């Protein structure tokens, strides 16, 4: 038991170590990081606190890492909160008043903030002021409290759920996109060096191309391949070993996992290729709607295997080809949702 706790603690330390320390270490997202570096440098050169930043995109692509990089670049503290925990003004009050000048206030899943808490944040973002109600009943009064200038960094997987007033208060907004296989291989090379893993370039590329364009997943798979090689291959990691290790996880050569394939084959086998509504699909696959929409669908759509129409989800001819299925019953709908 002590050994297991030690291993978990060690892996947690590596999780932190794998996070890039600055924009120069952040591999991929070249246009985004170039704009962000210019934005931050210009503010610092003027002696100002940088404006508020919003990062949006699928999970696991580095939005949290970018928040840490912003704080490190500014050279101040980082205060972290999660949107679902911020429901009412009192949830924000202590966090906002604790901020020092130049601190970065990071809200993950900012689209899940409560509406009342979100509106309370507006004046804090725009004027660095908040109103506090003193007492209650007929004698209640409101006083305005000045806040130290700070930079808010928001991260969301669903930018469309942000209200326009909140979105408009961000000076910088950037989409974090899926990574190329080449960028992921570079990230894995850095990670393998930090973790002390001896893997050749072909093995790292094999892991990269099955990682769904997602660094977080790539690093997790790298650890799995390490464990597999340790127990089955005498710590030797080449492309063949990587392929065997990933096949054991039921990850195919396109990066599709068991749930991806179940989703596609369910539409093919039970709904003649679609269209099928997301609620029905959620029940059939056994995954909640949010997980399907945030985790699985974006990658399948990116790979051209799935499309969304006004009538529901449909598989594409490419999906039939990849799964080696007959597409005689495939319907053709051009209307996109």
Curated annotation (Swiss-Prot):
One of its GO terms (cellular component) is cytoplasm. DNA binds at residues 308, 313. Mg(2+) binds at residue 64. Gene3D superfamilies: 1.10.8.60, P-loop containing nucleotide triphosphate hydrolases, Winged helix-like DNA-binding domain superfamily/Winged helix DNA-binding domain. ATP binds at residues 18-19, 60, 63-65, 126-128, 169, 179, 216. Has 3 domains, the large (RuvB-L) and small ATPase (RuvB-S) domains and the C-terminal head (RuvB-H) domain. The head domain binds DNA, while the ATPase domains jointly bind ATP, ADP or are empty depending on the state of the subunit in the translocation cycle. During a single DNA translocation step the structure of each domain remains the same, but their relative positions change. NCBIfam families: PRK00080.1, ruvB. Belongs to the RuvB family. The RuvA-RuvB-RuvC complex processes Holliday junction (HJ) DNA during genetic recombination and DNA repair, while the RuvA-RuvB complex plays an important role in the rescue of blocked DNA replication forks via replication fork reversal (RFR). RuvA specifically binds to HJ cruciform DNA, conferring on it an open structure. The RuvB hexamer acts as an ATP-dependent pump, pulling dsDNA into and through the RuvAB complex. RuvB forms 2 homohexamers on either side of HJ DNA bound by 1 or 2 RuvA tetramers; 4 subunits per hexamer contact DNA at a time. This is Holliday junction branch migration complex subunit RuvB. It comes from Chlamydia felis (strain Fe/C-56). The lineage of its organism: Bacteria, Pseudomonadati, Chlamydiota, Chlamydiia, Chlamydiales. The gene is ruvB.
